[in-house]
Amino acid sequence: MAFELPKLPYPANALEPHIDEATMNIHHGKHHNTYVTKLNAALEGHSALAEKSIEALVSDLDAVPENIRTAVRNNGGGHANHTLFWQILSPNGGGAPTGELADAINAEFGSFDQFKEKFADAAANRFGSGWAWLVVNDGKLEITSTPNQDTPLMEGKTPILGLDVWEHAYYLNYQNRRPDYISAFWNVVNWDEVAKRYNEAK
């Protein structure tokens, strides 16, 4: 079964002014769609791999034949990362986490503000293209970043919050001001979705 581009869970203009409609249309409809198209092309003739979930596929790249492994890593990673990204954003987002996730963030990072600072540092200091992540690793929260379209799933970690810092994610609106984009991100984080993923992963 071929992988498919998921629909956005909100209109393309719903995250404005923090993430603009033009960026969303290009980012989702062009960039993410291209990852899906190229992933399906790479997996032609490999039906057993194509039937896996995207998470299972990128979690076990050693099972992917060497001649298509790079294509699956890049495009499968891009599909997995963006599928999560759209879900953890919301026009009704922002604020702060509550419940067990809030307790875990405070225990691991000292406070929500300290967590945001460390996460923003990971995003701002990721050289070139990549992602910043909040992951669950052996039941504990960690902040990490990955290059290109690599996903923490490739390292056995479960991402629950991700920020795309490829220039295509922000350049139309923010140009070279990546820190401004990172600051705007906090206004649209869907903490209910992040908490759900935390509870499933811990």
Swiss-Prot record:
Keyword Membrane (UniProt): no
Name this protein carries in UniProt: Superoxide dismutase [Mn]
Residues noted as binding Mn(2+) in the record, renumbered to the chain: H27, H82, D164, H168
InterPro entries linked: Mn/Fe_SOD, Mn/Fe_SOD_BS, Mn/Fe_SOD_C, Mn/Fe_SOD_N, Mn/Fe_SOD_N_sf, SOD_C_sf
Known catalytic reactions: 2 superoxide + 2 H(+) = H2O2 + O2
PROSITE patterns: SOD_MN
Gene source species: Halalkalibacterium halodurans (strain ATCC BAA-125 / DSM 18197 / FERM 7344 / JCM 9153 / C-125) (Bacillus halodurans)
Organism superkingdom: Bacteria
